[in-house]
Amino acid sequence: MPLYADIVLPLAQPAYTFAVPEGMHVEAGQAVAVQFGARKFYTGIVWRVHDRRPPFKTVKSIQRVLYGAPLLSAQQMAFWEWVAAYYMCTPGEVMRVGLPSLMKPSGDTEEEFTEEEFRPRTECYVALAPGLHDEGRLHEAFEKLERRAPRQYEALLELASAGDGERIPTGEVARRLLRADYAVLHALERKGYIVSAERERTVERGGSAFRLPELTPAQLAALESLRGQFARKPAALLHGITGSGKTEVYIHLIAEVLARGGDVLLLVPEIALTAQLIERMERIFGSRVTPYHSKLTNRRRTETYLRLNRSQGGEFVVGVRSSIFLPLKRLQLVVVDEEHDASYKQADPAPRYNARDCAVVMARLWGGRTLLGSATPSLETWVNAGSGKYGLASLTERYGDAWPPEIFVSDTIRAAKRGERHAHFNKLLLDKMEAALGRGEQVMLFQNRRGFAPYVECSECGWTARCPHCNVTLTYHKGGGKLVCHYCGYTAPVPVKCPSCKVTDVVPRGFGTEKVEEEIARLFPAARVARLDRDSVTSERAFNAIIADFEARKTDILVGTQMITKGFDFGGVSLVGILNADNLLNNPDFRAAERAFQLMMQVAGRAGRRSDGGEVVIQTSEPGHPVIRQVAAGDYDGMARAQLAEREAFFYPPYARLTLLTLRHRDVALLRRGITELAARLRGRFGRRVLGPMTPPVDRIRGEYLAGLLLKVESGASSARARELLGAELKAFSEDPEFRNITVVVNVDPQ
């Protein structure tokens, strides 16, 4: 009976059916090479095998199977299907992020489509020949070699001393013998003294005896609470103030799972955090720790995926959001550190998934548990914990002898009126910086805007430099002497004359991290100043160098964007300055207050890791703003109550589920007709739950105009039914000849 296979390709298309050649064995989850179109060859994943011939005259056949074993387990396939359904994309789009790029080769001819590049690496291993396990014959070999071939004698002695039957990589032997080369080993093999063989490179997993950190009574209580709650609930929140020692609790739970032979996934929001965390975890768990992030080479990510796919358990992966797609077959625990961080949400391309939410579903599919950790949890997670859907454990005391920082709120308007403001710094902050530097301590300054200035302006006529492709001003980067669009990357030189009125008075306005760095170097000429933002960090090496210098106290003042807020632990920092809290609060987003609170508390936490406390200065023109007061008091509960009351009144998450639809096209008139038509269609289905059409703050990017619609559905309603209805309307819209070329981006649970 002829067989057919539904194949998922890395395209925004549904699965396609191919014939299975006679004699070829394929099964669900396997990778195969197929021809799609006239000449294009792709890697695909077998989704199901059946005997139903599709209604086509010609059915193309699978070219070949690319791996022996399936790349996806049944659980992974169910997870991919959930991601595709929930985030309204295709399994092929999930495949784009779910597999490393070397595992998805494509080419215009079958000859270009080679497996060689993604075969696992092998190493050459050597061992004593079986005959030399007899002591007499081994002694005879030593006597022959000691005078005639001393280097061969030393190599054989080294191998024999490694233990009976021990296999050693040739590279390790060469390192131990310093000047020994492969010729020595080849000579020993020709004489029959050793044997060699190639085998796949593996990672030594080590034992289960870990040197775990001691826990305080508060941490022990939290650990016991989590153990009990995991017996009843699939997920729990560990709510611990900054510096309370959440990581130590993670470590004990991780050790328990690894000791049982289970797999653990520890998610962090930023690549920047992985290096410090991996180093810390390796001190405890050794070679069991496997990093996974985009800064690793394609080859390394592929090797990691293939090794994990063969593993039978006991794996510990530390990685960023894409790590949720790794093949951890015995997954028992997923830890999501800083669960509130918006970096867990993928913006583009599809699937626009939130790794935190996916982790909860993923662990449930595997029968495992999810631990969400944060000092300032997202309000969605906070409500889930408060309602009993998730478990909840709290850490309200700081770990060790650390004291919370003292927070000062400095009014920028009052300081300016009193003549107590110099450049972009109030006198209060400058005085405290001088005192801290005088004591040999370090300072961190946070400004949530990179570049030298947000824009340049003509003082005479008000002209500003704007991007020709996007509806935004160009940011001035003094270091490169150019204007840059942070949306499309367009660059332009700074004009000498105003293009509008020809006056030579074009000046930068506002301030970014570059300008802060320059002004601080002028105000504190003896201080060593460094900057940490996307412009200064051009590579992982550059990032590590900046962090290492600050950690070693080779830098006195570190200026940076959000990158400096993410979980770093610098013992020398006694003062943190938040230079402009206003631009955190004044965003047109219902999450602005929550995000501002979270970010300022994170920044403040960098000064709260000392036995003598620390100090934080918040500069703002609105010292009486409720969020500023809540940050100064460390009042998360107060912030949560106030924001939840507003969300409930205006029907926003967690009391509603949002889906943002963004339409894009170069013809603004066509776009307006399209958005009006789609809004009418959706209102016919959802009524007043549809908001818009809306014009986003940046309504043109890369030459395309943008318009939006927001769908709000009650959190208690069936989200699956809402997606089904929405999908049907979007399909009908895309099939309309007038609007078929309009791009519709679907963003479920936008952040």
Question: What is the predicted role of each segment?
Answer:
Residues 524-527, 682-690, 735-740:
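Short secondary-structure junctions
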